[in-house]
Amino acid sequence: MIIAIVKASIKDNKHKALREIANILQFEYAPNEEGCEQYESFIDGDTFITIERWRDQAALDIHLEAEHVEKYVPKLRECVVDGCFDVQFINTNDINFARI
């Protein structure tokens, strides 16, 4: 399983536009994407966060090349500082555990 945690700072007066775009991705596209197990976006003050969970890397790769991603990610970039997202990827196959 691949988990992506996406985070960005929202530009002034862009909260509403960002929420509208994020809702399109979360409610219209993500539920129908093969291999998408979770896709939730949150706004906390001036911080935008999306948590994505994908069955495997292949499903995530297909998502990243999807037409709706190419269409809406540039619109999301217009709403965030420097047009950049910080993304942390977690591959559950590569997580090391310690018993303490």
Regions from the PLM with identified roles:
Residues S9-E20:
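Short, surface-exposed ligand-recognition loops at beta-strand->loop->(often short) alpha-helix junctions
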Residues E40-T47, P74-I100:
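Glycine-rich beta-strand-turn "strand-cap" elements at beta-sheet edges
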Residues M1-K7, A66-V73, I95-I100:
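Short flexible/disordered coil segments
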Residues I10-D12, D56, N91-N93:
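Non-catalytic surface loops within mature trypsin-like serine protease
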Residues H15-A17, A59, N96:
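Intrinsically disordered, low-complexity acidic/polar segments
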Residues I24, E28-E37, R53-Q88:
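An amphipathic, aromatic/His-enriched active-site/gating alpha helix that lines ligand/cofactor pockets
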Residues I2-S9, Q38-E65:
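Short, well-ordered beta-strand segments in beta-rich or mixed alpha/beta enzyme
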